[in-house]
Regions:
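Exposed, low-structure sequence patches enriched in small/polar residues
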Residues: 1-175
Length: 175
């Protein structure tokens, strides 16, 4: 809904999304449900969002996640996140996010942040950094650090060129 009677609050967003993933034989592999009970967009253009995500996965025997072998079976877990994003209309905008929950039924957390610079009207440069930690029950802790850089040139609202570069400590490579 929109809030025309207030200057400080423009709109609130309440969403639900559901995704199904199947293999080529149309067998269910995993599902994802996203609940966003609260998203607020303020008069300044800044926004804050809380959401919960429910995951299920049925990995085949021997599948590995970041080098950790998973037992065949059905996995189910929840994640909860709180995020803030400053208005993209500013020359400099920031984003922050924290997420807690599980991954493959092991405790997990994620912290991230980003910075975007609007160098001039047609050129945007930004980078994001995140740290994800999983405390596996049967393996050493995984700590994944990812840094991403992105540059975008806008020629018109319908035409732009964007380039992304990313590094993560798991693969120890740039891609």
């Amino acid at each position: 809904p929109n809030y025309d009677e207030t200057d400080w609050l423009v709109t609130s967003i309440h969403e639900y999304a559901f995704e199904l993933y199947t293999d080529t034989g149309n067998n269910l592999i995993d599902t994802k449900q996203r609940f966003q009970p609260l998203g607020l967009v303020f008069g300044s253009g800044d926004s804050i969002t809380f959401e919960s995500t429910h995951h299920t996965d049925r990995p085949p025997s021997g599948e590995k996640i970041w080098g950790i072998p998973l037992e065949k079976g059905k996995y189910e877990w929840w994640n909860h996140s709180l995020s803030f994003e400053s208005s993209g209309k500013r020359k400099i905008s920031v984003s922050l996010e924290t997420e807690r929950g599980e991954m493959y039924e092991s405790p997990a957390s994620r912290y991230g942040g980003g910075l975007k610079l609007k160098l001039w009207k047609k050129f945007l440069f930004g980078f994001d950094y995140s740290v994800s930690t999983i405390d596996w029950e049967n393996a050493p802790q995984t700590k994944l650090k990812v840094i991403t850089g992105k540059a975008t040139i806008n020629f018109s609202p319908d035409l732009f060129i964007s380039n992304l570069i990313q590094y993560d400590n798991d693969s120890d490579s740039v891609g």
